[in-house]
Amino acid sequence: MSDSKVKLSTVPLNWNEIYYTNCPLVSASNVDQELGWTKEEFKKIGVKYAFMRSVRENDWYPHYIHNLDNLIRFGGLFPPIHVHADIRRTRLLGVTHAPREGGCLIVRSRDDIYRMCELKGKKIGLSKSLNTIKNDWWRIQEHQGIELMLRMNGMTMDDIELVEFPYADAWYNDPKMLDPMENPSELWLKRDHKHDLAFRPLETALEKGVVDAIYTQSKPFQHLQEATGKFKAIEDLSRYPDWTLQVANIPAAITCSDVMAEQHPELVVTFMKGMIKVGRWANEHKHAAAAILDKQTFYLDVEDTYRGIEHIDMVPNLSPQNLVSVEIGKDFMVRHGYIKNDFNVHHWAAPEFLEMAAKELINERWEKITGDKLPQASTARLG
């Protein structure tokens, strides 16, 4: 079936319901799966808050093309850039950056290859989704990482042979994948995500010698692959001091539809209040947060997750540095034709929702602290 004939499915719009979706990466949203604090915030205002896939009617496509007005997404950077550029207008509410996960290049562990320059004339794999409905974020991440690592070693794409690996990438509305689930990590009850090669599609080609090297994420994925004893990294962008190299589908971005932002800003503020609260807790309890994130992410284990998040600020923000990181990702997509329409990242960013959420939390905390210490006023004296 051609992509133009694919039937997309979402629930009817109801502003008394807000859905969320997230990627299996480091974010306050993933930690909140166990805490439930954002759900509590929505309950205070009488709104249902649930995972996008908690109802069968929602297929997986809203995670990639945001075709659900009452959805808030917290996940990898490239899909929401594509959505805002070429599909529909959204708002960028905040980001969380993993500043030392730029990506690395791995080869077979027993190959006589130790430096990037030894890959001249050799084959590097590059995935290619055949699904034109959604963004090919795997490929963009690989392409950007490979290009950067070559450049850091005085090389260009002309020095190597790129080998494409097309795949159908068409499971997003497959009935077998649409059983409802309350939490994102329930997907991993069906699949061992840390060892499922569906999440590392080029690894088999590397192992069999079809290619000589592939891109992988620094730390997540990398440590899982190295633990097999079959692979080793010969270059790692995370070891460079240049923070602009850390662009592996990150920073993770929070986005909502322009319809939600304009017609129901209180819902956006409520979500951001939850993310701030959970992010603060995660910053103060990194080991506990690591144990939660280990169930969903691609670090090797809990301790590896802790080392990965130890220096990450889990409270979403829109700092000048992080907005430049977003811009770097967007500019790469424009330059290489992954999006058709350019846009201004600073116009996309909507810091007012984060600011309002922070103010409301401060006011609520102040009222609680002072209210608990004040006597009940006498009605007679008030009169």
Question: Which residue stretches match the model-derived regions?
Answer:
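Second-shell loop/turn segments in exported
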Residues: 25, 130-136, 259, 279-280, ...
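Short, solvent-exposed loop/beta-turn-alpha elements that line the ligand-binding surface or hinge
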Residues: 39-44, 240-244, 315-321
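Short beta-strand->loop
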Residues: 91-99, 161-165, 230-248, 344
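Secondary-structure end/capping motifs
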Residues: 262-340
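Conserved C-terminal helix/tail region of periplasmic/extracytoplasmic solute-binding proteins
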Residues: 2, 334-383
